[in-house]
């Protein structure tokens, strides 16, 4: 949650106060509103009590009043952080006029007739940066590079073909992946990168949790359910335990796991992902993401851009 709105409607508000303290603990900006003021004979007294409890101003409104509704909107806008919405997917990697090449395998996981959400969002972000955007499938990478008058400033690839693209890219072109971009955009890249090193200490007795935000029906060669577990077991051993959760499912107790690998989280906002990361940090469990983990397993983590 980026901003919380707590509605108080009378003298009974202990449940709301519990939520208030929860949001305060999470450093979430909170607007406290005493609503239905037109039905309360002692709204000023209740507001004073709430102010004493919360140590912040209480907005007293009635939804029947247009002026009160406008006051509510103004207070809500006031709580929006100054830098809200300024972060972008490609960040400082590109400038206006840069040539960017997207490598997007159209395998069984790619939905027929459309692109997946991270690709769509990244293309829009690049267009907003006024970049020149080209795209190709993995098998057409060499043909595409040969057709260009100059090397791309940046190549963004699907993480599962990281090594293939790295081996074929021009030396001067920066390389990243959609998942790595979202690691920075939606999460804590520094922690993801640091945690990827935990892969080297895993054994066949270790437990890994893979967390994906999508709730789609898994397909053959699914990156989270098949490809990453297979890559890990190939390196560590067939005995490695890999648990998988999806959607909003995420264990409160993470202490049984030696590593968590989170997807790019294109479906969730940053605050939601950071809540997971904070939980992992509190329980001292390393947490990485799909792209960062694959880059580590491919031996190119120190050679990619983000």
Question: What are the functions of these language-model segments?
Answer:
Residues 1-59, 88-92, 115-134, 138-147, ...:
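Conserved C-terminal guanine-recognition region of P-loop GTPase G domains, centered on the G4
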Residues 7-9, 103, 158, 263:
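Short, well-ordered coil/turn residues at beta-beta hairpins
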Residues 10, 36, 106-107, 214:
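Residue-level signal for short, function-critical loop segments
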Residues 12-13, 39-40, 65, 109-112, ...:
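Alpha-helix N-cap/loop-to-helix initiation residues
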Residues 28-31, 36-92, 99-101, 108, ...:
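Canonical P-loop GTPase G-domain recognition
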Residues 94-96, 202:
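Short flexible coil/turn linkers enriched for glycine and charged/polar residues
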Residues 100-106, 207-212:
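Short beta-strand segments enriched in small/hydrophobic residues
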Residues 113-117, 122-306:
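C-terminal effector/interaction modules appended to NTPase cores
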């Amino acid at each position: 949650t980026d901003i919380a709105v707590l509605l108080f409607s009378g003298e009974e508000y202990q449940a709301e106060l519990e939520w208030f303290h929860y949001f305060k603990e999470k450093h979430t900006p909170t607007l406290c509103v005493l609503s239905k003021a037109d039905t309360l004979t002692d709204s000023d007294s209740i507001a004073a009590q709430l102010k004493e409890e919360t140590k912040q101003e209480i907005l007293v409104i009635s939804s029947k009043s247009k002026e009160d509704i406008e006051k509510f909107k103004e207070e809500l806008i006031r709580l929006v952080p100054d830098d809200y919405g300024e972060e972008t997917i490609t960040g400082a990697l590109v400038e206006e006029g840069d040539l960017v090449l997207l490598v997007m395998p159209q395998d069984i996981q790619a939905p027929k007739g459309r692109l997946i959400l991270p690709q769509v969002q990244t293309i829009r972000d690049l267009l907003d940066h006024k970049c020149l955007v080209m795209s190709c499938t993995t098998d057409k990478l060499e043909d595409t590079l040969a057709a260009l008058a100059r090397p791309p400033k940046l190549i963004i690839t699907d993480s599962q073909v990281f090594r293939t693209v790295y081996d074929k890219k021009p030396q001067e072109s920066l390389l990243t992946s959609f998942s790595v971009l979202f690691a920075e955009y939606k999460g804590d890249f520094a922690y993801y990168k640091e945690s990827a090193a935990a892969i080297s200490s895993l054994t066949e007795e270790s437990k890994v949790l893979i967390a994906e935000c999508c709730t789609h029906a898994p397909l053959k060669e699914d990156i989270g359910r098949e490809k990453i577990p297979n890559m890990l077991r190939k390196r560590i051993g067939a005995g490695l335990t890999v648990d998988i959760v999806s959607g909003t499912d995420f264990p409160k107790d993470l202490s049984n796991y030696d590593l968590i690998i989170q997807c790019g989280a294109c479906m969730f906002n940053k605050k939601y992902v950071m809540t997971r990361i904070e939980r992992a940090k509190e329980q001292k469990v390393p947490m990485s993401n799909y792209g960062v983990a694959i880059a580590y397993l491919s031996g190119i983590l120190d050679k990619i851009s983000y």
